[in-house]
From Swiss-Prot:
Organism: Deinococcus radiodurans (strain ATCC 13939 / DSM 20539 / JCM 16871 / CCUG 27074 / LMG 4051 / NBRC 15346 / NCIMB 9279 / VKM B-1422 / R1)
Protein name as catalogued: Methionine--tRNA ligase
Subunit structure: Homodimer.
Any one GO CC term of the record: cytoplasm
Record's keyword annotation contains Zinc-finger: no
Organism ancestry: Bacteria, Thermotogati, Deinococcota, Deinococci, Deinococcales
Gene behind this protein: metG
Amino acid sequence: MQNPPQHPEAQSPETRDREFFITAAIDYANGTPHIGHVYEKILADAIARYQRLAGRDVTFVMGTDEHGEKISKAAAKGGVTPQELVDDLSERAFQGLWKKLGISYDFFIRTTSAKHKKYVQDVLQRVYDAGDIYFAEYEGLYSVGAERYVTEKELVEGPDGVRRFPGDKDPPELRREANYFFNMQKYQPWLLETLQQNPDLIQPAGYRNEVLEMLKEDIGPLSISRPKARVPWGIELPWDTDHVTYVWFDALLSYLTPLVSQGQDASMSGKAWHVIGKDILKPHAVFWPTMLRAAGLPLYRRLVVHSHILAEDGRKMGKSLGNAIDPEELVAAWPVDAIRYALLREASLGADSPFGEGVLVSRLNSDLANDLGNLLSRTVSMIQKYRGGVIPAATEPTDREREIEAAARALPDEVLRLVDELKINMAIDAAMSFVRDLNRYIAESTPWTLAKSPETQGRLDTVLYTAAEGLRVASVALEAVIPTKAKELREQLGLGRQGYPLQAAWGLTPAGTRVQGGAILFPKPEPKADETKNAEAKPPKPQAKKEKKTVTDTAPAKTTEQKPEAAAPAQNDGLISIDDFAKIDLRIAEVVACEAVEKADKLLKLTVKLGDETRTVVSGIRKWYEPEALVGRKVVLVANLKPAKLRGIESQGMILAAEDDAGNLDLVGTELDLPSGTKVR
């Protein structure tokens, strides 16, 4: 037996192949796309975009699978021909949605196209001539949903006690049929050895282990045809026109059709990254490799398997459950780049991931609006205010600027390494950590203070340039995820729509560039109508009636003087007296330690020094500040606030902060370095 090919994966950018071939699963055109389709295509698109930014020649293939029994039934039910049905679904429902989501595929293959039919028949004839396809009669359990024969072991018992193939509404049918079969088990030893020698071939590793378990038993032959008299909607076998090829040699070969039809070598299959859902693992991990082997083509480079998207409450999503997300409604209601960001940031390949409006709004507000959008607004605004809209040159760099430059130069390799490891969410977080550090840098540098003194103008220039160039670097690191907004960000910086490679670089923003400004990059969503109803719309709470005292016959009533009625209290105008204000004890406090509160996205636990006293304060400023950035900072504390427990931690005061309409937040402090415990009055 020939040794299986090796598939080295974690290659450095210098040793990677220049060519990069990626596919997303070919979608079955018998219904409209769901949120799982959306996630998969955004995932594959982000990987493709990252590789383009890294300078690789990318070929990205998608398409629709348009033959089969289910399509014939759906067309008959709708009163149209199968071709009319797939034309509508492929062009309107699928390609239309991918365009709205910014999916940057290079080829979109339809399996009803003439070029695809020709390639399928060419490969079938080649495998048939080699003796790996034969005619036989077979009886077994057939899943209409999966469009293949299944084994008893693959069935799962439902709540009603009926065993079904996962995802099917109906139990499998017992079918006996004479079809053509592919001698798949011939290549089982080769496939097993290949998987054992290439641990990164199928990722995440848990899915590779599933396939290894499958290969412990005889995989048997694969039925690849149906009688044309029963299923006429398919590609005829070139040696027997009474049969059509069914599913596998049709759908899976669609990954290669665009290459072959463009005159490229089908051996590009050996460079492919296939991105698929876990529900079609077996066809891609067992059927497809053995088909490639029989056709004399190299095995793909990597099979990327993603899990399912769940409802926000962790339940499975479905129309029957009333919690399905309509992708068309989603893109109509929310910014596309926010959808892309939230799905990629929240989901991880190895586990089913919850998603919904709450998740989307949280990421939109905290990451995109507060962190990235506000950084852009602040930077552009300060350049306009302090430098007439022109980005100055950095003239007085300190260790802090050199630290930011080093982080910026290291970021591209870190992002690409994480993408190669399929940790897309972590790659995004690496870029956003850089953004958050830029926000801390501005807060630490206080450019608004530097602007006041002639002696610190050079320092101000350096801070403004560092912020602008840092934003450019961040935009490139995030461009694969938020492609439209990344370009808009650079336009606001005055850099036009010029593209930049994802590589270690600093100083590519020319000093003297005039910023353009523009609309808020990621506006925060307006509250829903039912969230904005004020208390006046609610009926007043009923007042408790005072119990009336009665006078008994045995107790003489007392006579009392009639007191004049008290004057009506003046209407509350929101003002307080100086005496009221004097009750508030405001003090300077120094942060000596800070940490995030577990399982609380918004809270930080601060240990502050108040003169000789040490206190614990819990504050909801986590989305603006990293814990380590606050250590050593002096803040204003409400020192005589009644203690309150937050997440089981007693908070002994309140830190004062100011937030503008754009969501920029700054802690209240003093220009002088006053001792902790100093009273504010």
